Amino acid sequence: MLALRKTLLHGRLPAAPPAAAAAAIASRIPALLRRLSSSPGDGQGGDEWGSSWSTGITKEHFDGSDAAVGRPVTSPSKPVSPELAAVRAMDEEDEIFRAMERDNREAKAYVDSWGDRMRETCELLKQVREPGSRGSYLKDSEKQEMYRLHKEDPETYTVERLAKDFRVMRQRVHAILWLKEMEEEEERKLGKPLDDSVEVLLDSCPEFFNSHDREFHVASLPYKPDFKVMPEGWDGTTRDPDEVLYEISMKEDQMLYEEFVQRLQFNKKKVAGEVKCHKYSRRRPDDGWTYMVEKLGAQSKRGSGGGWKFASLPDGSSRPLNDMEKMYVKRETPKRRRRIMAPFK
């Protein structure tokens, strides 16, 4: 095969066999065909060619007038010119180049698509581990409707109901209501509506953002074995892991919600100027400071397990703590739990 390929490329064929050798080969062909034949001839020295089909070889194969089965064979009597050989070589090279270019295009498209594949995989894994992270955008028109309903009937449209109706977290409802309240106060001061061109643009092009869909907190549990000594007579049944995860998630969500409300109330008072944070604004009053005193309990305990707190006035009298002071005390109370952090944040 290698010699034939070199022959086709260079246009040179081997020399024809001598005439004597060709005559000897031709004289042996009838005897060979007679052996290959499955049935004898007619007794007159003739050969029956029809039965030789069982061998897959016909007379034309030996005469050189028929091509081999399934592949063309170039006759030695037709020499290949150098021009034809060069054209065939160029065609083969062009075919190789076209195959290489096609493979390069396919490989480049495959490599370029890896960025989108990785982003899609990251989003899918994020939804699997924390399904509540899908809620990422809420239209301004929906925020306006939320604030209008709460302002008209706050007892009916509570924070819990608005969070359930609009399928968002309660923390977002608190933030949206406070934001719309501040915008309404600012419009009242300016005497004209605020510029809402950005909000209108976002509402008119929602395809650029992910729609909100049932925000909720999902706890991140440690993946490690938990060995327990079960009581005698235990039937071998355990709780569903999804049920345990749901209960823990609800407890953590309630704790996060309470902390958010406390911080939001503090920020509201801070924005209103009721909380003084600057060091030069905390000057000693003319009549003296008011101190908070904590009385220890029976077993010298502090906090909820011990005594109680009250305010000591400069004149020596005392009074219970007001709402502002209670808020300060609650913010200073340490939270005896691990820090709750949402994954992928």
UniProtKB/Swiss-Prot annotation:
GO terms for cellular component: mitochondrion. The keyword Transit peptide applies. It is found in: Mitochondrion. Residues 36-81 are annotated as: Disordered. Expressed in roots, stems, leaves and florets. Disruption phenotype: Normal vegetative and floral organ development, but several defects in reproductive organs such as reduced pollen production due to abnormal microspore development, aborted seeds, reduced endosperm nuclei divisions, abnormal distribution of free nuclei missing an oriented positioning at the micropylar end of embryo sacs, and interrupted aleurone differentiation associated with unusual positional endosperm cell differentiation. Residues 1-43 form a transit peptide. GO terms for biological process: cell communication; embryo development ending in seed dormancy; endosperm cellularization; endosperm development; gametophyte development; mitochondrial membrane organization; nucleus localization; pollen development. Keywords: Developmental protein, Mitochondrion, Transit peptide. Its main location: mitochondrion. Essential for fertility (male and female gametophyte functions and development). Required for the integrity of female gametic mitochondria. Involved in embryo apical-basal patterning, and particularly dorsal-ventral patterning, during early embryogenesis, and endosperm free nucleus positioning and development as well as early endosperm development, probably by modulating the expression pattern of related genes (e.g. AL1, MYB3/AL2, CYP78A13/GE, PNH1, HAZ1, MPK6 and OSH1). This is Protein GAMETE CELL DEFECTIVE 1, mitochondrial. It comes from Oryza sativa subsp. japonica (Rice).
